[in-house]
Amino acid sequence: MFISEIQLKNYRNYEKLELSFEDKVNVIIGENAQGKTNLMEAIYVLAMAKSHRTSNDRELIRWDEDFGQIKGKLQKRNSSLSLELNISKKGKKAKLNQLEQQKLSQYIGVMNVVMFAPEDLNLVKGSPQVRRRFLDMELGQIAPVYLYELSQYQKVLTQRNHLLKKMQGNSKNEETMLDVFTLQLIEHGAKILQKRFEFLHLLQEWAAPIHRGISRGLEELEIVYKPSVDVSESMDLSKIKEVYYESFQSVKQREIFRGTTLIGPHRDDLQFFVNSKNVQVFGSQGQQRTTALSLKLAEIELIYSEVKEYPILLLDDVLSELDDYRQSHLLNTIQGKVQTFVTTTSVDGIEHETLKEAKTIHVTNGTVDCEIDRE
């Protein structure tokens, strides 16, 4: 699949923009704070209906405006689709072929993207929240039902945490309501956990050989899911629910004392092992970056295996963060088969056949000054 054009209105520092793209490689060049990352973000938001940079949708709307809009044309193997996302203070509305979607979960997954930005290099050594977000965003693209379960879980979690804070003063009168929220949380949480296990099993199958290739056969990568309760991938849904129920009973008084939910998918984490050593703790910076790159390349292949089309790859100022070897491995892997967007302050020092065939877009202060095809 590839995006052939995009239109922005009141998005970040763009008042109005219409731009067409090549189906292979597009290089967006500009100095810092000119709008190249905003353009890249707009493509991501068009696909995912949320930003990878902020959870506050208001930040996506141009200063002093009431709404922002992103439109795009997506070319898939057997169809052409128009996508539209309208952002206002009241929320977001999405359209497919001019038809408004009742739920964003019906919209997300139509256009698949993989974002690789400098912050993704922190996927390995960053906080558990970064790794959970990675899971949620990638799983949501190939399993819309996961997004539904996740949104329901988060709603119940918010209500339950509010009740737990209230119960810190007097818990006697609210225990029945707490039990109701607990059962709802278990129902959605168990399904989320099961989907995560399935996804990571597939991701492992792709990431391990990719990592082996990048490391020239010297390293073996293993991805391990670390749940907050004693469950395993081999358990069925009913057994997972049973373990959750028992675990919630055992931490009930602690949760009331702390005023927050102490177990569940929102507390889980991932660990990465290279040659049986925890790369988060003992890995070199090179091993951590190879692991992050392996995960991103595995995402591309996993999405292809599920939807039978390659996703759109967004490389936001990340090439300069990779050494020549990893840079070349990345570009060699995607060459000719994945529509790719690259942002950079300059193409100097990046010598690769892929970029020589690219369409180049120069961005200055929220406007596209010129577009040329590199010779």
From Swiss-Prot:
One GO MF term attached to the UniProt entry: ATP binding
CDD domains associated with the record: ABC_RecF
Highest taxon in the source lineage: Bacteria
Protein localization: Cytoplasm
Ligand binding (ATP): 30-37
Protein keywords: ATP-binding, Cytoplasm, DNA damage, DNA repair, DNA replication, DNA-binding, Nucleotide-binding, SOS response
GO cellular component: cytoplasm
One GO biological process term: double-strand break repair
Sequence similarity: Belongs to the RecF family.
Task of the protein: The RecF protein is involved in DNA metabolism; it is required for DNA replication and normal SOS inducibility. RecF binds preferentially to single-stranded, linear DNA. It also seems to bind ATP.
Name this protein carries in UniProt: DNA replication and repair protein RecF
Species this chain originates from: Bacillus cereus (strain ATCC 14579 / DSM 31 / CCUG 7414 / JCM 2152 / NBRC 15305 / NCIMB 9373 / NCTC 2599 / NRRL B-3711)
Gene from which this protein is expressed: recF
